[in-house]
Every structure is written in C-alpha cells, then in structure tokens.
From Swiss-Prot:
NCBIfam families: L28
Keyword Ribosomal protein annotated: yes
Signal peptide: none
InterPro entries: Ribosomal_bL28, Ribosomal_bL28/bL31-like_sf, Ribosomal_bL28_bact-type, Ribosomal_bL28_sf
Record-given protein name: Large ribosomal subunit protein bL28
Family as reported in the entry's similarity comment: Belongs to the bacterial ribosomal protein bL28 family.
Keyword DNA damage included in the entry's annotation: no
Stretch list, region Disordered: 1-23
Gene Ontology biological process terms in this record: translation
MF-aspect GO terms: structural constituent of ribosome
The entry's keywords: Ribonucleoprotein, Ribosomal protein
Superkingdom per UniProt: Bacteria
GO cellular component, one term: cytosolic large ribosomal subunit
Amino acid sequence: MSRVCQVTGKRPITGNNVSHSKRRTKRRFLPNLHWHRFWVEGENRYIRLRVSSKGMRIIDKKGIESVLAEIRANGEKV
C-alpha cells in the first residue's frame, strides 16, 4: 500500500538530513498516516480510510459524506 492520504493526497517528499557539520544526506519526509474507521450513516456501515491528521480534521469539518463523495468523484474505489 502506498503512503498517500486518501483525503488530501499528501505523499512522501524528499529532503536532506543536515548534521551539525552541515553535511547533507538524502532522506524522505513521510506523511502522518493512520488507518481509521469512519461510520457512514447514509450507507449504515464503516468505511476504512488511510488518512493524515489533516485529512481527519477535514472530515471533522466537512463531514464524512461530502468527503466520500469527493473521493469517489476522483475515481477511487471506497
């Protein structure tokens, strides 16, 4: 499974580790992803999504029904 938030589309980005002597080596910054179950009242079932912390805040703000509609409009099967 790829490390991509299903709500925001956040994915890993690359950057540098910087030591005290300012020597740089490549590294990845991973999004803060979690598997989370959301109750969908309209479908009378749970939906399991891989979401970032920001994705959870968006769901709290907009509601799971509207967020699911957006995800499905993008062609993702949920």
